[in-house]
Amino acid sequence: MRVLGIETSCDETAAAIVERDDMGEGRILSNVVLSQIAEHEPYGGVVPEIAARAHAEALDRLVDRALNDAGLKLYEVDAVAATAGPGLIGGLIVGLMTAKALAMAAQKPFYAVNHLEGHALTARLTDGLPFPYLLLLVSGGHTQMVLVRGIGDYERLGTTIDDALGEAFDKTAKLLGLPYPGGPAVERMALQGDQKRFALPRPLKGEARLDFSFSGLKTAVRQTATELVPLTDQDVTDICASFQAAVADTLSDRVGRSLERFKTEFPDCATPSLVVAGGVAANKTLRAALENLCTRHGFAFIAPPLNLCTDNAAMIAWAGAERAATQAPDSLDIAPRSRWPLDEKSAPVFGTGRRGAKA
């Protein structure tokens, strides 16, 4: 089965074609991604209206390129899949409407894919990973620990109660006057800094719950920087190094508890695995910390290639292909969802916002 996938949930416009054979093995036939970094850089973050307009301007030619790169015509694909949520509603509308139109014109089945499910299943495309396994999703919009039991069978073990990790990186970079996107900028500066200079907090470290929290760490960075104004270059590099070390330590504690939970629930699993996905997974320091953690706990550490860790359409096409193997197509009446939990059975997680408790 060959599936055309479309991804427009945030600030990457993407189209791809993936093939899934009868044995469940996958192959990427094409994977085209157009980043909007240049459009959003002047604002220091993603502007939803600009993102939606950029998707609308670029998506048709990206679909054409994906088909050309795969050597296929539209009628030769077997299904069309698109991200239906979660994400920025304007971008989701652009991708979903385009995918529905293509599916209707070519008379092909249509699959509405949860963006998080795309990340959750990528390791099955790249590594043929069997169920069950653990997924750590760390991106600008999400920080979650998910138990993946099967297609559509997910349990959220932990999530952030305030800020996503990628957001904490971006806000730290902006505070320190570093360029957008913030994650790579902080990582570059941290290479030259002293991670022991500032004693930044490790939120929730030592607690039995498996959730994450990064707002307190972000606040500590702001307070530290404010006390040092005017900042020297060395101050900036040391803050970045201390921030990154605190994140690595926090992740190791939170994820380590999830690894123990997995071994308790699946004591007979021959090859327990931790999959790391999302843009923050590109950070070499964090990857090294998690890889060492997996080695100590007897887990395989799996991180898909960088171009498949960040937002892309190959993961959406693959998730559509996995669903097509076992499920009926979705209706063309399906609507985009800006919020769409991967595990809808889980109770809401309550954190603290400016106006008090929030879900």
UniProtKB/Swiss-Prot annotation:
Binding-site residues, substrate: 137-141, 170, 183, 283
Region (Disordered): 328-359
Gene Ontology terms for molecular function: iron ion binding; N(6)-L-threonylcarbamoyladenine synthase activity
Coiled coil: none
Enzyme Commission designation: 2.3.1.234
Residues that hold Fe cation according to the record: 115, 119, 311
Homology family: Belongs to the KAE1 / TsaD family.
Name of the molecule in the record: tRNA N6-adenosine threonylcarbamoyltransferase
Organism: Brucella ovis (strain ATCC 25840 / 63/290 / NCTC 10512)
Gene name of this polypeptide: tsaD
